[in-house]
Amino acid sequence: LVPGITKEFNDIDEAMRLGFNWAKGPFEMLEEIGVKNFFDKVDEYKGNKFLENLSNSKDENFYGERQKYTSIETLGKIKKTASSVDGNSSASIYRFNDFNIVEFTTKANALDYDSMDALKKATDKPLIIINESMQFSAGVNLTYTMEFANKNDFKSIEKFIKYFQETCKHLKYSKYPVISAPSGLTLGGGFEVLVQSNFVASHTNIVIGLVETIVGLIPAGGGCKEMLARWLNTEEAKKDPKYAPLKVFDIIGYGRTATSPVEAEPLKYLLPENKRIMNRNSLLEVSKKILNENKDFKAPNELTFNLPGKAVIDDMNKILEKLYNDKVILDHGLTVAKELAHVLSGGETTKDKTLTEDDLFKLELDAFMRLIETKQTQDRIKHTLATGKPLVN
């Protein structure tokens, strides 16, 4: 195996631990036994060049000094050494000398007001958003949202969405860099946190996307805004002002998801510069390395948008008319899609008018609030929470 498959013993140990759920790899165990004890128990090794060389070496340990085994620094290990622990019932903040970590702690790491509060409080230093559980975040906590909707307390929902937007903008333009290190589900609001982080170190096992339309809503935490920005930054969009809104309309409208970084990149859920990590246990180490490489970090400039308004709405309506006539979407599906179209078009604007990020946030918020107040969207959410399946209405 060494050096035929890999040059490092660590790689073999890592593969055996991850593949067979072992506590220690074979070379780690031999390291603990020691070279002398190992050969005291081995009867035949003549003819095996590797074992002969090892037997003749003067190393006391199996790895030797140069290849001494060093375990990977995972979240589970490092958080025990935090200088302080802060947070609430939805997220924990682990504070270290030169950076902070936020770990979501709700079921499926669904996001609520407290989750956002923890993120905002943790930006007083460079921040890594990472979880020990298998999911990054399944999105906004719909149960939390419906508790307010059932009481017709839509002002509380609006307050939460505004705070979500405010927090995500704060992450993006913080004095210090923010890194998201996702694994598993990274959907809806979870994606919106990621896309407004400054850096991404993504596990290759990831399910990522904006799926709000499935439950009768539209992304309202910056998802529409950021996807527009990414697609506007293409050669096609520079030639055709309708290109980016139509592309994002298709992606968000169908609730498209990707199941790997390779699939996510063509949708622009992830970008070429985002790190991809095969070993989930290495997410924290890679994130810390990114921080070390960006000591001179400066926050990006705020985005501006020039969107075509009614000119692209007409094209979107033609698409929706065909889908509706073909019964691909029903009455409320049409309503949701029209709200999405209004946001992505820029609303009452023309391509000569410049919109700010706050303008796009306002469009997202208004559309979200109009939808959450409808019985049909509430029916979709209740059905999904009860069955785990979408309701088509």
Enumerate the language-model features and the residues they cover.
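Helical "substrate-binding/catalytic lid" subdomain
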Residues: 1-41
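Short acidic/histidine-centered micro-motifs embedded in hydrophobic/aromatic stretches
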Residues: 15-19, 267, 387
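Flexible loop/turn segments at secondary-structure boundaries
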Residues: 23-24, 109-111, 135-139, 186-190, ...
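Glycine/serine-rich phosphate-binding loop and adjoining beta1-alpha1 elements at the start
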Residues: 28-32, 39, 54, 61-64, ...
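Intrinsically disordered, low-complexity segments enriched in small/flexible residues
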Residues: 32-130, 232-256, 260, 266, ...
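A structural preference for short, pocket-lining loop segments at secondary-structure junctions
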Residues: 97-103, 113-155, 162-181, 203-207
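Conserved catalytic cores of soluble enzyme domains
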Residues: 157, 165, 169-303
